Design a protein with these regions (language model features):
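Forkhead-associated
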Residues: 3, 7-84
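Regulatory inter-domain linker segments that are low-complexity and enriched
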Residues: 1-2, 83-100
Length: 100
């Protein structure tokens, strides 16, 4: 289960990927004029839960740093346009850590 919180609103998703942006065809459409129509996506990889920018005009930021691609960690803050998001997930939703 993936939980995204923005401006006090909570959105829950059972599976990935999740696309976000201004366009209504996104999994999470957001009303923010600074967002691209298809701004970013959350997906699952062997690394964990990954946030990927989809070549947006204004970029995707994690913890204040522009991040075209970022493996999310608990407590990370995501900024897209002027929208701040927190992303939480059930540890079982992410793949196990890689063995070295």
């Amino acid at each position: 289960m993936i939980r995204i919180v923005s401006d006090g609103k909570e959105f829950r998703f059972k599976s990935l990927p999740i696309t976000m942006g201004r366009d209504e065809d996104n999994d999470l459409p957001l009303e923010d004029v600074k967002l691209s129509r298809h701004h970013c996506r959350l997906c699952r990889t062997a690394e964990g839960i990954v946030l990927e920018d989809l070549n947006s005009s204004n970029g995707t930021y994690v913890n204040g740093v522009r991040a075209p691609r970022h493996v999310l960690a608990a407590g990370d803050t995501v900024l897209i346009g002027v929208t701040t998001l927190s992303v939480e997930w059930d540890p079982e939703a992410a793949p196990p850590p890689r063995k070295r």
